[in-house]
Regions:
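Extreme N-terminal starter segment of soluble prokaryotic enzymes
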Residues: 1-6
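Residues at the beta-strand->loop junction immediately N-terminal to the Walker
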Residues: 8-10
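Conserved glycine(s) of the Walker
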Residues: 14-15
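N-terminal phosphate/diphosphate-binding loop that engages ATP/GTP or pyrophosphate donors
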Residues: 18-92, 103-104
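Phosphate-binding/switch loop-helix module in NTP-utilizing enzymes
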Residues: 81-124, 131
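Inter-motif core of Ras-like GTPase G domains
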Residues: 125-148
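Charged helix-capping and loop-helix junction motifs
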Residues: 126-132, 156-159, 184-189
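C-terminal lobe/tail of nucleotide-utilizing enzymes
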Residues: 160-232
């Protein structure tokens, strides 16, 4: 039985937030009480009172009313890694704050979906990376991958690091973020053959992007029973 899931990527800008929002929306539709967490977010706020766009999306589609300091313990107003941002802004990162927030969310919900920042080797502190956080949370993981040329290399590097860290990898989601690059069925076949892992779905490119339509497409392409969520 899966109690939580960490959504990471093989690169930045591969659509982790869209995939995470799709998962939590479908879980809500299955009458599962799902919590969301994005331990680290970065970028510009829409205004002084708003959250990061990614966090707003996750809270909207999950229906979350949890305190923001649990859902998103750290927000940096510069688009860089937590390690780099904390140095630039002089803001110390407490790893205990992250794990405590996760534990509290887990007590309040059937399960928690956690969206990472960047990829597995994105630094949180000088000697602590996203992969270390996943390992410490002891949480199942899926990897969102794009479809641009070079994706297979990036995916295999990510996969090998998962094995090195003994992470509990559930499989992959292929998200076509641009019209060019790998043909989706070919990419899916390669990833399955090279990793011997599940590819849950391939989401085709959407020229005029609409998140609600994306979530509908995700629902059509994914059999959620494969995730093990129905055992919750």
């Amino acid at each position: 039985m899966m109690k939580s899931l960490f959504v990471t990527g093989n690169d930045t800008d591969v659509g982790k937030t869209c995939v995470t929002a799709s998962i939590v929306k479908n879980l809500r539709d299955m009458d599962i009480d799902v919590g969301v967490m994005k331990p680290f977010a970065s970028g510009n706020r829409k205004n002084s009172n708003s959250l990061s766009q990614d966090v707003e999306i996750l809270m909207k589609y999950s229906g979350s009313h949890d305190p923001i300091d649990l859902v998103n313990p750290y927000f940096f107003e510069i688009p860089t890694s937590p390690y780099d941002a904390s140095k630039i802004l002089g803001q110390k990162i407490s790893l205990q704050k992250i794990t405590d927030a996760y534990d509290k969310l887990l007590l309040s919900h059937d399960l928690v979906i956690v969206e990472g920042i960047g990829g597995l080797m994105t630094p949180i502190t000088q000697n602590y990376f996203v992969s270390n956080l996943i390992s410490e949370l002891d949480i199942d993981t899926i990897i969102v991958i794009g479809s641009k040329l070079g994706t297979v290399n990036h995916t295999m590097l990510t996969y090998e690091h998962c094995k090195q860290m003994h992470l509990k990898l559930k499989g992959f989601v292929i998200n076509q973020t641009e019209p060019n690059g790998y043909e989706l069925s070919n990419l899916k076949q390669q990833i399955m053959e090279l990793t011997n892992q599940t590819v849950y779905c391939t989401i085709p490119y959407q020229k005029n992007f609409d998140l609600d339509l994306y979530i509908d497409n995700f629902t059509n392409f994914v059999d959620f029973s494969n995730f093990g969520f129905k055992d919750v």
